[in-house]
Amino acid sequence: MLYQILLRLFFLVSPERVHTLVFAALRAIAAFTPTRWLLNRLCAPTDPILGTEVFGVHFPAPLGLAAGFDKDGEGLKVWGPLGFGYAEVGTVTAIAQPGNPKPRLFRLPADRGLLNRMGFNNHGAAALAPRLATRTSTVPIGANIGKSKIVEPAFASSDYRVSARQVGPAADFLVVNVSSPNTPGLRDLQAIGELRKILSAVLEETTAPVLVKIAPDLSDADIDEIADLAVELGLAGIVATNTTISRAALKTTGVEDLGAGGVSGPPVAARSLEVLRRLYRRVGDRLVLISVGGIEDADDAWARIIAGASLLQGYTGFIYRGGFYAKRIHDGIAQRLRAGGFASLQDAVGSAT
């Protein structure tokens, strides 16, 4: 109730400004041992049934913070105490860039969603690398890498290679982002020929587990092709899905006037779940599947787990649900695991298929 009142106040300020202020407040809380300890006591998962190990990394709980919130890894001390089982920072690019002109982040309140065209604003992979190397995070940290805007698509593999070389050694896993709608031509890199070059280049540069993040707007045939390529190349997994360019069934008025961008939150949930189910049917346990897109509560999270997701991510749900977002979801997952007679989280993965 209190957070809903705060949310109304937040909505009086531009979304990007609120993000800056809230993120600064979270970092301030986590900077001091007593307040960080208190936050950890209130929010961090403690039930051992939530823990899982995938691609050689132990995760204390399955819900992580999705890429986009902590673009430059400035809040690495925050995410574990706030209840997340891990965090994916970025997207970072080989060349630092300011992103698209403001305004570039918009609320869709009637849909509990967001529309963004941030454009990979970040300080660069070289700036993130030392933060990862010296971190004291209590949870795994992955790094999401994208293409620098000024780099032509023909040279994309070399650009991704640079980022992988810089952040790969200190990241628990790498996610190759070829699915944001906000960098011109980026989604074209999901074509199998181009994607093969990029993923092969990244794999040559790092020993960290490598995953690829895909768009919800791909055709089913394209999803199958990418899944097969991921298995062939020996990727650790697939993150599904990024934001959607679809405006179908949005309830928020005036969305047409907001311009281009990707939509996140509940509007992408159905397609995200559909893509997850298709991927699991295609690859089974040969790849780790991380589901993201419209996960608001424990019911949503559980639906993704039994459909085949080993890990989950949230961002928009965190914005709309507040600081206990991760805790409530993890508590709900633990209750469902025990009620269903599962001995571990991994036992529940794909159990509905």
UniProtKB/Swiss-Prot annotation:
It catalyses: (S)-dihydroorotate + a quinone = orotate + a quinol. It comes from the Bacteria. One of its GO terms (biological process) is 'de novo' pyrimidine nucleobase biosynthetic process. Its EC number is 1.3.5.2. FMN binds at residues 67-71, 91, 144, 177, 213, 241, 265, 294, 315-316. GO terms for molecular function: dihydroorotate dehydrogenase (quinone) activity. Pfam families: DHO_dh. Its main location: membrane. Pathway: Pyrimidine metabolism; UMP biosynthesis via de novo pathway; orotate from (S)-dihydroorotate (quinone route): step 1/1. It is a peripheral membrane protein. Belongs to the dihydroorotate dehydrogenase family. Type 2 subfamily. Monomer. This is Dihydroorotate dehydrogenase (quinone). It comes from Mycobacteroides abscessus (strain ATCC 19977 / DSM 44196 / CCUG 20993 / CIP 104536 / JCM 13569 / NCTC 13031 / TMC 1543 / L948) (Mycobacterium abscessus). The gene is pyrD.
